[in-house]
């Protein structure tokens, strides 16, 4: 199977998001890369489902809480930017202060 670099990046991101989901389910707090991966995957899947950029910007702020991540992680992530594929093309989605 031949994949483009972008497709490989997406697969890596989704793999990290799956690991993060499993760790959350076990009651573990997420670290920086796991938190970014989980929120990014949420945005990409929402775009695929046809949600609007505005709704994903808002919903992306409610994927994780401070209690679900390790100390200091919320301050390390002032915003997350994801180029997601919507039904009408690719768009950049920015979520400010994603962990509240």
Swiss-Prot record:
SUPFAM superfamilies: Urease, gamma-subunit. It is an enzyme of class 3 (hydrolase). Keywords: Cytoplasm, Hydrolase. Optimum pH is 7.75. Its EC number is 3.5.1.5. GO terms for molecular function: nickel cation binding; urease activity. It is found in: Cytoplasm. It catalyses: urea + 2 H2O + H(+) = hydrogencarbonate + 2 NH4(+). GO terms for biological process: urea catabolic process. One of its GO terms (cellular component) is cytoplasm. Pathway: Nitrogen metabolism; urea degradation; CO(2) and NH(3) from urea (urease route): step 1/1. CDD domains: Urease_gamma. The apoenzyme can be activated in vitro in the presence of nickel ions and carbon dioxide, which promotes carbamylation of 'Lys-217' of the UreC (alpha) subunit. InterPro entries: Urease_gamma, Urease_gamma/gamma-beta_su, Urease_gamma_sf, Urease_subunit. The keyword Membrane does not apply. It holds the Pfam family Urease_gamma. Its main location: cytoplasm. Heterotrimer of UreA (gamma), UreB (beta) and UreC (alpha) subunits. Three heterotrimers associate to form the active enzyme. The apoenzyme interacts with an accessory complex composed of UreD, UreF and UreG, which is required for the assembly of the nickel containing metallocenter of UreC. The UreE protein may also play a direct role as a metallochaperone in nickel transfer to the urease apoprotein. HAMAP family: Urease_gamma. Belongs to the urease gamma subunit family. This is Urease subunit gamma.
